[in-house]
Amino acid sequence: MNTRFLDACWGKPVDRTPVWLMRQAGRYLPDYMRVRSKCTFLELCKTPELAAEVSIQPVDILGVDAAILFSDILTPVEPMGMALDFVPGPVFEHPIRTMADVEKLRIPQMEQDVPYVLETIKILRRELANKVPLIGFGGAPFTLACYMVEGKGSKDWATMKRMMYAAPEVYAALMEKVTMMDMEYLNAQIKAGAQAIQIFDTWGGVLAPSDYEKYVLPYTTKLINGLNRQNVPVIHFVKGAGTMLDSVKRAGGDVMGLDWHINLGKAREVLGDMAVQGNLDPTVLFAPKDVIEQEVKRVLDENAGKPGHIFNLGHGILPTVPPENAIHMVECVHRLSQK
């Protein structure tokens, strides 16, 4: 098996920089759209054979060094008692607003409530046995709670912030419950065979650094400390965290996911020997191939050949990216970083 990705997570030397892409199983791939045209997004997530098929596609098509489970961060929230739909973005019919709402939430029994996720992981481990490692994932407690409180996506997350400031006891009760659910969910993925875990805190960066420290860090730290992570590295990705990397580091992950708003070399100065993942601007993949190569080289140069670097985009790959540009990016990473 290609172990470059796992070796880099642990800061071990590798013969070339490993690369994978957030949202690498997605709409930019015609093969994905062929599968997706036959079912809804939720049906795809809940059908293990199909979810496994689209998870493997980028490994075969792009030549990436890791596969990531195809699912959605809100998958385990639905069985807490929250009806979920995608129209096209995620929408919860009854958002969390009061302590009574929080008290109604249940902690799912993962093997009974999300068996399709665990079965997808088992299929993928069999299918990927001689290829690449499998990354499991979940949303960070704060990002999950944002959707649960707002009921849908938001530009400013004002309802969530209002709860945080004006009803701190409701906020704390919700975050405790979501953290416990998240811990159960990610541990179930590890038990099923996930070889690494990525925690996505997509909205952690919308807070002031002091608010992140007070309202988010304790829960993410509790989550990471509660994972059964012997030999399973944890990647912690907080979008927009460039000004508070020292705080995010204290949550205790093994790898820091970086978006494209920070120089990778500067991030290294704050993070020390911690492994890093990133951080090409996703829109670079719309550029001509020579520009893509220049930008890949820039990111690699910022890392300055230090061990513990996984190449990735700074956020998910965009749906209209030409697949051949993503293939070219992967090829450039491998060629330019070859020892």
Curated annotation (Swiss-Prot):
Disulphide bond pairs: none
Location of the protein in the cell: Cytoplasm
Keyword vocabulary terms for this entry: Cytoplasm, Decarboxylase, Lyase, Porphyrin biosynthesis
Gene Ontology MF, one: uroporphyrinogen decarboxylase activity
InterPro entries: UROD/MetE-like_sf (IPR038071), Uroporphyrinogen_deCO2ase_HemE (IPR006361), Uroporphyrinogen_deCOase (IPR000257)
PROSITE patterns linked: UROD_1 (PS00906), UROD_2 (PS00907)
Entry-linked SUPFAM superfamilies: UROD/MetE-like
A Pfam cross-reference name: URO-D
Oligomer and partners: Homodimer.
Family recorded in the similarity comment: Belongs to the uroporphyrinogen decarboxylase family.
Role description: Catalyzes the decarboxylation of four acetate groups of uroporphyrinogen-III to yield coproporphyrinogen-III.
Entry protein name: Uroporphyrinogen decarboxylase
Species this protein is from: Geotalea uraniireducens (strain Rf4) (Geobacter uraniireducens)
Source species taxonomy: Bacteria, Pseudomonadati, Thermodesulfobacteriota, Desulfuromonadia, Geobacterales
Gene of this entry: hemE
